[in-house]
């Protein structure tokens, strides 16, 4: 019965492009921190699709395995987490990016985008160039991002795919907010140049 009450408080919008628990997040978090299986399952199903998509689009050797490792890390440390849903998203992607970097270091894989898939891109908002970019198909964005340096690509994918704020991206990547803003500006400017050379219908 307790689970039914909690479930009613939770948003059912779990689109793969934006992990959303909704107004019931605080209740779900408290339950998860006490080890309630239903709450841990809710967090996993709410956030794992976008983490898996991020791993795939970043060309991880085994994206499913890395995603599972991310959530094992979340499970081990969730008792110490404090914050709202936005902070939780940032925290998860901090863990995810760290695992991705470790995987690249151990396997010797260079950053390389995966083959295009039809991922749902989050609508993070922003300036005209970013909004235009968000209207492109996910396959086209992947192809365009292939031409960016790794740091610019990481920032734009976290902004567009995960829907993180500049502050959250800075935390996830271990950079200053100013550095993230600069990378986003340069990345969008480079994408605009690519689009001017190879225009597509927006």
Regions flagged by a language model, labelled:
Residues 43-61, 77, 145, 196-197:
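Amphipathic, Lys/Arg- and hydrophobic-enriched alpha-helical face
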Residues 2-8, 12, 171-172, 188-202:
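C-terminal edge and immediately downstream basic/flexible tail or linker adjoining helix-turn-helix-like DNA-binding
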Residues 143-146, 150-154, 162-179:
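Helix-turn-helix DNA-binding module
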Residues 12, 33-41, 52-69, 177, ...:
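Short, charged helix-capping/linker segments at alpha-helix termini
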Residues 65-72, 86-98:
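Structural recognition of an alpha-helix C-terminal capping motif at a helix-to-coil junction
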Residues 19-23, 29-53, 141:
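A short, charge-rich alpha-helical start-of-domain segment used by transcription regulators
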Residues 18-22, 102, 110-138:
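Internal acidic/polar
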Residues 57, 79-83, 94-115, 134:
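Arg/Lys-rich amphipathic alpha helix in sigma70-family domain 2
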